[in-house]
């Protein structure tokens, strides 16, 4: 795998969790997985790591006749948890204040930085001498690696039969390379032009198979509304594009063993959850007489925080309490503060990133809010189910694939609901659904059955990992079919 993030080594969002968990899940299925990751500032190779000096030829300037420049770096082979971590150590590229930029601006040489990651990954894999079955890239940062595979290194024996996969975690992020820096990629680009090179688009076009992180988002992404400007590219891939829902690591997210919680619990004995609820309310000055709505994430309109800010006053009037943990948009933060200031016993606003506090909210809240405008997969709703906190979500992306409205009519053979769902991204739709949840919370027997039903569901990585196995097999089958068809066309031309 080629990725820019991997938990616990480098993380800005859910991508890191997916890369780590999927690599471990594939290892548990008997595969030998390597993860290539930049050695960012502050990332120390784990104990037992092996240092390997490498020299990679990189472009020294624009123009096809410009000679390449030997570039020295170090590859660290690190023992991982079920997979091998390979850190690409090149301080001029990766020893920086941020992963992708700083002060709100991307680094202008991001294309060159992640092209280096891709070139090193391919060179190291080829040098191993063992045939590489699959090159699996994640998001635009893997675009250069996939471009390189499409433009030549298959002459190396170890890469000759390698199939390539691109997983698109969020189509809103593209990785634009300015035109004056396009030469730094050292690769031909389909999308090169006055606007530069779009690394996401390049990766989509270069990979044997492309997937995104839920079936519904895969369908949504074929439209201009959700496709992030690459909907036509995705439609062009046809049967080579699909959605595979993310899982969660149920060994890391387990209320029965979570050390961040005041009390642990499971679906058979929920008394610990009530302890956690009362503790959460007490520590943040909330009146625990009403249901607690929890929300954790990046303060951004994509996540629906503007809907919550607009609906919050009415939500309190209905009898709800609200606790929000997250950082982000300053305007949204101030709107939430405007609601919180006069209601200190009903609203807690935690303007920070705090992993342990997030766990306590997942455990202590009654209802977990995810009113996203779009949500490629979503992790919060799965953690909430695991912790017995009922999700209230907007029907989009992975939320639509995982949360079933408890009040929706059910035909014979369908699975009972596990949460509350609304359709339209409006404060009114959110409030209408919140009122249903508030009413449901008062029926304690039915509510506890709903809680236990959610906790019993399996959203681990074992199922998704097998779907990725199938994706790899399908990529190889389609590659073989394409090769046979190409050979047959060549025979026809030769015989004409």
Placement of each model-derived feature along the sequence:
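Catalytic cores of nucleotide-sugar-dependent glycosyltransferases that transfer UDP/GDP/TDP-activated
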Residues: 1-496
């Amino acid at each position: 795998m080629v990725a820019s993030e991997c938990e616990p080594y480098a993380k800005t969002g859910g991508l890191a969790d997916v890369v780590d968990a999927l690599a471990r899940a594939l290892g548990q299925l008997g595969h030998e997985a390597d993860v290539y990751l930049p050695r960012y500032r502050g990332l120390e190779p784990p104990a037992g790591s092996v240092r390997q000096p490498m020299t990679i030829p990189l472009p020294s300037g624009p123009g096809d006749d410009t000679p390449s420049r030997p570039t020295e770096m170090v590859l660290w082979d690190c023992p991982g948890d079920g997979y091998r971590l390979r850190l690409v150590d090149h301080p001029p590229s990766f020893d920086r204040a941020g992963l992708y930029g700083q002060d709100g601006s991307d680094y202008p040489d991001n294309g060159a930085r992640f092209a280096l990651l891709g070139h090193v990954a391919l060179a190291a894999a080829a040098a191993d001498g063992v045939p590489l079955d699959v090159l699996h890239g994640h998001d635009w940062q893997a675009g250069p690696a996939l471009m390189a595979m499409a433009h030549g290194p298959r002459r190396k024996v170890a890469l000759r039969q390698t199939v390539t996969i691109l997983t698109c975690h969020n189509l809103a992020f593209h990785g634009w390379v300015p035109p004056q820096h396009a030469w730094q990629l050292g690769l031909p680009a389909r999308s090169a032009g006055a606007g530069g090179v779009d690394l996401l688009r390049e990766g989509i076009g270069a990979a044997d198979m492309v997937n995104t992180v839920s079936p519904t988002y895969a369908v949504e992404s074929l439209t201009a509304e959700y496709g992030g400007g690459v909907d036509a590219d995705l439609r062009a891939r046809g049967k080579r594009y699909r959605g595979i829902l993310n899982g969660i690591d149920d060994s890391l997210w387990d209320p029965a063993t979570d050390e961040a919680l005041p009390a642990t619990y499971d679906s058979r004995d929920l008394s610990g959850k009530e302890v956690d609820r009362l503790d959460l309310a007490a520590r943040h000055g909330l009146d625990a007489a009403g249901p607690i709505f929890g929300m954790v994430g990046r303060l951004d309109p994509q996540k629906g925080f503007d809907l919550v800010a607009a609906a919050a006053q009415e939500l309190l009037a209905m009898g709800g309490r609200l606790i929000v943990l997250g950082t982000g948009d300053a305007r949204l933060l101030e709107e939430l503060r405007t609601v919180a200031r006069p209601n200190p016993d009903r609203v807690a606003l935690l303007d920070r990133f705090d992993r342990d506090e997030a766990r306590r909210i997942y455990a202590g809240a009654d209802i977990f809010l995810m009113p996203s405008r779009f949500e490629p997969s979503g992790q919060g709703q799965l953690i909430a189910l695991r912790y017995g906190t009922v999700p209230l979500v907007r029907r989009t992306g992975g939320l639509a694939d995982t949360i079933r409205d408890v009040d929706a009519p059910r035909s014979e053979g369908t699975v009972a609901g596990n949460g509350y769902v609304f359709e339209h991204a409006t404060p009114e739709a959110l409030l209408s659904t919140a009122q249903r949840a508030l009413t449901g919370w008062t029926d304690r027997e039915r509510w506890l059955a709903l809680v236990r039903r959610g906790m019993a569901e399996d959203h681990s990585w074992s199922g998704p990992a097998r779907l990725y196995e199938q994706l790899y097999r399908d990529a190889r089958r389609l590659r073989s079919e394409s090769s046979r068809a190409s050979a047959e066309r060549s025979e026809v031309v030769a015989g004409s």
